[in-house]
Amino acid sequence: MIIRHLSENIINQIAAGEVIERPANVVKELVENAIDAGATRIEIITANGGKNFIKVSDNGCGIPADQLTLAVSRHCTSKITDDVHNICFLGFRGEALPSIGSVAKLKLISRTKEAENAAEISVTAGKIVGPKPAAANLGTIVEVRDLFFVTPARLKFMKTDRAETNAISDMIKRIAIAFPHIRFSLSGLDRTSMELSATENNTQGQLQRITQIMGKEFAPNSIALDAERESVRLTGFACLPSFNRNNSLHQFAYVNGRPVRDKFLWGAIRGAYADVMTRDRYPVAILFIDLPPAEVDVNVHPAKADVRFRDPGLIRGLIVGAIREALQQSGIRPTSTRSEAMLAAFQTQKPLTQQSLGNFKNAHQSSSYSPQSHHFATASMVHKPLDSTNSFGLKENATPIMEGLNTPSGDAYIPSTIPSSEELSYPLGAARAQIHKNYIIAQTQDSLIIVDQHAAHERLVYEALKNALYAKPLPSQLLLIPEIVELSEEDATCLLTHKDALQKFGLGIEPFGPGAILVRETPSMLGKINVQALIKDLADEAAEYDTTNNLKAMLDYVAATMACHGSIRSGRLLRPEEMNRLLRQMEAIPNTSTCNHGRPTYIELKLADIERLFGRK
């Protein structure tokens, strides 16, 4: 076997396999070149998903006629000289055009403002023809035909025309978000599929461009980010936890204007939402990271989708801290999608018929009416005085907030008093009723609010546990009779590796034979809890955490699990004072729009929406 030099054309085809995987990659490379050329208008036309035809036109600075041959030659570029660590352009390798020309039919027409005429050059399967004079306006036009006709085997890996067109559209959207001052147009040979008008190149302009791409729901559900550490600045938008998706396609990250899809950045975003979102949902966020070029390596892969930071800890800390602070400062702010889903669930009821009223009439005629028989309580009922509670609704004597209260029996509580204007001015308003033993109905000056009492109190207890834990270990209470919990040997061994972490929460466990755990102490803050259920829930998740590397994650999960077991349960009736106290605590504590599992704690329905349901507006 003889070692020999590969031909330039074969080298370009190999390089094309790294840079050009599908038509969307061709569009990406050509659009990035247009942006680097200072274009303010970029038009893309495709046919058959870009497999047969791609045309990218721009009004950038153009390429001089005497440099066109260099432009389609490998490793020829005007964007860098000898400092590969100080890259300020999207493209810099000089590989895109020669790679495309080696596997397709490429035609490039360009004109600079100094030139009287444009010039044209063609590359077919690596063979260069031209340059020669042509007619064109200022800027560059690149046409690509019959992609991969040199390597037809690659076409077998292409998806349908629709799928490839969607990939091109997604690629343009991802780039367009970072450059709101550029007008983008995407069309087929017969119709325009996307038109993004230019906006101001500032925060407001970015939000307008994002709204063009993400839809009108984005703006009311997003929070602006602006944070800085050392030489790194983070801007962008993070959406409310309840405004989430079932995949990560709505997460966008840009490093010095370059769109990247980096798992490290996705992990940082995930970590920022860890306390407020379920694991099977994904936050919506758009991040712009600006830092000195020497602090980031964009030359990790030819596709330039991955980057490597010199100080990844600084970047992660900045992202997590900025998003969490923004979420905490957002206050009581329900997502618009909840109320819209709620409105969609309402239906105009069918007229009551004699048949539908039959059972009710029979029941009514067979018994006399009384408030108690219909499970209603009056505001004049005599109750025991409320026990003193701390700011989180947890009693100082470590009994849960609602334990031992003399609450009426029934399905609902409806107070007869009318709330004052001061009570209605609170963000979550004044409690007006409790229905189905779990939902608090509150009234504000211009809306109706429904609160899930268990989810809301779970978040309050969770925040209390975290604050208390990081201040000092939680006090525990000895069980009069220790409980033995039977687990599999694997689960028991895994949970016992977290014994010290659990002790910080006041949960004392020790081995008790193969697959068994003895529980001697429980957190006094939680009062009486179901020890068996708590230990089994902790064991189900403990295997995911390492005691050294992910201790904080483990502690947060333990706090969330304990909060779930120690909060107000569904089916517990509350008095007006208790309902209003819960509302005021929700207003005072951050992140109360969702519980620890990411479920919403309340839904707001505006009065205008209610009136619209009844045809009043």
From Swiss-Prot:
Q: What is this protein called?
A: DNA mismatch repair protein MutL
Q: What SUPFAM superfamilies would the database entry show?
A: ATPase domain of HSP90 chaperone/DNA topoisomerase II/histidine kinase, DNA mismatch repair protein MutL, Ribosomal protein S5 domain 2-like
Provide this UniProt record's keywords sorted from A to Z. Answer: DNA damage, DNA repair
Family (UniProt):
Belongs to the DNA mismatch repair MutL/HexB family.
Instruction: List, alphabetically, the InterPro entries matched.
Output: DNA_mismatch_repair_CS, DNA_mismatch_repair_MutL, DNA_mismatch_S5_2-like, HATPase_C_sf, MutL/Mlh/PMS, MutL/Mlh/Pms-like, MutL_C, MutL_C_dimsub
The UniProt entry's GO CC annotations, sorted and at most eight, read: mismatch repair complex
GO biological process entries: mismatch repair
Please give the organism. Bartonella tribocorum (strain CIP 105476 / IBS 506)
Molecular function (Gene Ontology), one example: mismatched DNA binding
